[in-house]
């Protein structure tokens, strides 16, 4: 895996998702969330580092936490995804939100089938998604 850090990709995601229509497309269109329309009236998007990996974080209303990460930066998927899912669950609980979705971006579509059991074992409101891309 390429572990070189490239903040440009995360910056692009953050900029794109700051547009409401892009956030709606990601959450509803790509992730399949049936969230009510009002959560899109108040959402935050920011970039930060978790366990030395850059992520883009979306907090949608008072309901949904989404972390987006570049799969190319994940050296050990089983271990890393497990850590991120657990940390996301803890953050969701700390903030009093309803759901957490970890989104891995890149050509790793087999990871969703291979590692989704990690999310299932934690909580039915924790989800793992693997997408080839999140913005056009």
Model-derived regions: residue spans:
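N-terminal, charge-rich interaction modules
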Residues: 1-64
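Charged, structured surface patches that assemble and position nucleic-acid processing machinery
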Residues: 27-34, 52, 117-136
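Generic marker of "main functional regions" within proteins
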Residues: 36-41, 45, 49-50, 76, ...
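A short, well-structured beta->alpha microelement
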Residues: 41-63, 72, 79-92, 133
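Ordered hydrophobic segments in well-structured contexts
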Residues: 54-57, 63-69, 99-105, 127
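Amphipathic protein-protein interaction modules
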Residues: 69-119
């Amino acid at each position: 895996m390429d572990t070189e850090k490239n903040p440009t990709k995360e910056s692009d995601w953050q900029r794109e998702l700051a547009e409401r229509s892009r956030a709606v497309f990601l959450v509803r269109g790509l992730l399949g969330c049936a969230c009510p329309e009002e959560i899109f009236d108040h959402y935050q998007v920011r970039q930060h580092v978790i366990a030395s990996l850059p992520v883009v974080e979306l907090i949608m209303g008072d309901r949904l936490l989404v972390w987006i990460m570049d799969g190319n930066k994940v050296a050990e998927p089983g271990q890393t995804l497990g850590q991120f899912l657990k940390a996301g669950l803890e953050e969701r609980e700390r903030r009093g939100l309803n759901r957490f979705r970890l989104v891995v971006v890149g050509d790793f579509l087999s990871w969703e089938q291979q590692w989704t059991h990690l999310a299932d074992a934690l909580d039915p409101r924790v989800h793992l998604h693997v997408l080839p891309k999140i913005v056009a």
